[in-house]
Design a protein with these regions (language model features):
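N-terminal Rossmann-like NAD(P) cofactor-binding subdomain of oxidoreductases
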Residues: 1-153
């Protein structure tokens, strides 16, 4: 079994879901948290937001400063409509990079249905067909062929 750690970024790290994700992944033996991103509080330590986190982690930074080439996986814990914009910018430039989206952006394949439910246009409709909405434990084999995983939340 490989001892190599997976390099990850968490975008939306200071929100409610993002903080829980940071807390859980900071304890994972096969994960190296490389970036913790938010739109506010740049430069602050994550422990400012959650005292449960004991591990020394990178300070909060902007997603504009990410070196995508060193990452294996990106978690997105953003408001609906935001993850699709970021994934659209990065997806084709970094072909080995995978994404786990905790918003609703890739849960619904039909752009018209997405708009009727969330009241915003989906700005990356071509990527919807390249994503899977799934609980990974139930679709272990199918999930491997996708780089965008919409996680139920």
């Amino acid at each position: 079994m490989s001892k190599k750690k997976i390099n990850i970024a968490i975008i939306g790290a200071t929100g409610f879901t993002g903080l829980d994700l940071v807390f859980l992944l900071s304890k994972h033996p096969k994960v190296k948290i490389v970036n913790l991103c938010a739109t506010k509080n740049i430069g602050k330590k994550i422990t400012f937001f959650d005292k449960r986190i004991k591990k020394n982690l990178p300070k909060i930074s902007s997603s504009k400063n990410i070196d995508w080439s060193i990452l294996d996986l990106v978690f997105l814990s953003l408001p609906n409509g935001e993850a699709q914009k970021l994934i659209k910018k990065v997806y084709y430039k970094h072909e080995n990079l995978r994404f786990i989206d905790l918003s609703a952006d890739f849960r619904i394949k039909n752009p018209k249905k997405y708009k009727s439910i969330y009241k915003i246009n989906h700005n990356a409709p071509k990527l919807q067909s390249k994503s899977i909405y799934a609980i990974s434990e139930f679709v272990k084999n199918e999930i491997k062929q996708f780089r965008i995983i919409a996680n139920p939340g």
